[in-house]
């Protein structure tokens, strides 16, 4: 009896040891899988990646060509006694915006404007952690374009291709707010709403810029873009009324984006207003 009881207990102890060993091995495997999964997840979404670097480069190049084309039209018009003409300048700005939207829109979203980037961020359509890099890229592109233009045409005051208030600062501030509101409202409609025809976004945004420059250019210069003003100001050393071209576009863009969001959906609560996108859906995955 005693011998048989010892054999059964020994078998039970061996069984328990095997079960405990199996549980320990399974736990180690699960921990290893979790660690590997977390590492893989962090590698898939790093703070800085090649993909994001490509977006930043696209913003630099897109802003460079936009500012170079638009400001070159202004500089050439002043140097040649008005051969480009004011309507020609307006058309140049509109076409430059349209071309850049179609060129880099599928890569970076073609913000090309710190006010647009900030407005998208406030609506939850662009990650806040990416805003400084985008804004720096846009200002850098504008400054590089301005430096190239200065090298080509010189920096004489009479050939100034930046923006400065033609009237009072308050008048220019109001004008910049309104035209940037208008621009961002259109951008939100044609570039972020699934119901809009996304393929026409570049045409619509470019046409809006053309119209804005046409009627606001003689008043404020129709900047609509802090980078458009800051770049030439840095290179040419002229900062007259620069605060107007930062405050006006920033507040106008944010207001325009939210105004469209308020009318985007009529059958959904406010908390769902900023949950869809079409043309800039790539920026939401950053």
Curated annotation (Swiss-Prot):
Q: How does it sit in the membrane?
A: Multi-pass membrane protein
Q: Where in the cell is it found?
A: Membrane
Enumerate the PROSITE patterns for this protein.
Answer: MIP
N-terminal signal peptide: none
The entry's keywords: Membrane, Repeat, Transmembrane, Transmembrane helix, Transport
Q: Which domain of life is it from?
A: Eukaryota
- Extract one GO cellular component term from the record: membrane
Placement of sequence motif NPA 2:
225-227
Record-linked NCBIfam families: MIP (TIGR00861)
The protein, known as: Aquaporin NIP1-3
